Regions:
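Charged (often Lys/Glu-rich) extended helix/loop segments that serve as interaction or gating elements
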Residues: 1-173
Length: 173
C-alpha cells in the first residue's frame, strides 16, 4: 500500500527512487505508474526520479507468464513505516536493507524484516487469532457431525484457514 509504505509520497509529494530490481541488463520497453488497493484515489505514484529531472512514468519491462516482477522503493526508512502505521489494515510490508560495495558493485543483505501476517494484523485490532482458530475449528467439527462436510473437507478447510491466518497480508503467488 502506498499509504502504508510511502506515506510522504502522497502526503507531501516526496519523490522516492523506485526501479525494477531484476532484469537489470534488459532495457525496459514499457512505461507505467504505480497504483495500489486503497479506499480512495490517492494510492498512486505518478512522479519518479530520473537521472536529471522528474518523470511522470516509470520505465518497466514486459511481464512474462509465471515470472515474478519486483520493484524496489529506496531511501525509505523507519519514519515512513511509523507514519504509515496500519492504514487500510494491510500491515507492514517485507523490508530489506542492503549495502552496495562501491568498488565492485556487489550488494549484501544487511537486515531482512518479514512483514505482518493476517494473524498479526487481527491481533493489532484486538482479535485473538487463537480464539478465532478455535471457534472456526468448532464450527467445522459441527459441520462434520451434521454431515454438511466430510472429515477430509474439514481437514482441507482447516489447512486453508491456517494458511490464511499465518500468511502475508499482501497478495502472494
Amino acid at each position: 500500500s502506498v499509504f502504508q509504505s510511502l506515506p510522504d509520497s502522497w502526503a507531501i509529494k516526496q519523490i522516492f527512487p523506485i526501479m525494477p530490481i531484476h532484469r537489470l541488463l534488459e532495457r525496459p520497453t514499457r512505461e507505467g505508474i504505480l497504483s495500489d488497493i486503497t479506499c480512495d484515489c490517492d494510492g498512486k505514484i505518478e512522479q519518479f526520479v530520473d537521472l536529471h529531472d522528474v518523470r511522470h512514468t516509470l520505465p518497466l519491462h514486459d511481464l512474462h507468464d509465471n515470472e515474478e516482477y519486483y520493484l524496489g522503493a529506496f531511501l525509505v526508512g523507519a519514519y515512513q513505516e511509523t507514519l504509515g502505521d496500519l492504514h487500510n489494515l494491510l500491515g507492514d510490508t517485507n523490508v530489506v536493507s542492503i549495502t552496495i560495495d562501491p568498488v565492485d558493485g556487489h550488494f549484501e543483505f544487511v537486515k531482512e524484516i518479514e512483514g505482518d501476517s493476517v494473524g498479526d494484523v487481527l491481533s493489532y485490532v484486538e482479535y485473538d487469532p487463537k480464539l478465532l482458530r478455535d471457534s472456526f475449528k468448532r464450527k467445522a467439527e459441527r459441520a462434520v457431525r451434521e454431515h454438511l462436510i466430510t472429515p477430509a473437507e474439514r481437514r482441507e478447510i482447516m489447512e486453508a484457514f491456517e494458511k490464511g491466518i499465518n500468511g502475508y497480508t499482501y497478495f502472494e503467488r
